[in-house]
Amino acid sequence: SQMRGRPNTRTVLTFVGKGDEKPLVVPFVREIIKVRSGKSNLVEPGFGYVRVVQFQEATAASLAEHLTQLYAKGPLTGLVLDLRNDPGGLLHGSVGVSAAFLPADTLVVSTDGRTPDAKRKYMATPDDYLRGTRTDFLKDLPAGVKNVPMVVLVNGGSASASEIVAGALQDHKRAKVLGTQTFGKGSVQTILPLTNKIGRASCRERV
């Protein structure tokens, strides 16, 4: 519990080892933990590799940056999207990643749930993948991104949002999916803002 708190506030951790006469007191400043949601590189000239580790708030925007950086080194003739051991995450992140490679207004995923709001279709359109900003980070992607031959890598650790991306790209014949059977989670998370700025709630939906 000592680890939790507002960013830039101070606290201490106290460690007591077996046989130690005095405890070890370590002061530290709390900070926001930033997890990299992806990485990329050129496997060889003309062939790009993008790994998505987890689907977070800014995953699709991060993907756009990686793709732009890859195309800055020259046109691609092939692209590998690695979703192995990606446990998934936020629904709009998977819609955004899918939208980077699919034609506009293409169906990405349908969700179902106990309430009418949970029953809906998500398309490859900014209204369905933008959250908290109206800046469309996919608008200026290199033209070749929509047509470059693709392979998506998956395994038993690929779940939730990563399964949505792999399934959407495969169903629309946009990419070949290679690897082993995925986890089969069948649910995703969405973030709902609460009133009076008291926080946010995480909600699960079945896909």
Describe every region a protein language model picked out.
Residues 1-195, 206:
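Cleft-lining beta-strand/loop regions that shape enzyme active-site pockets
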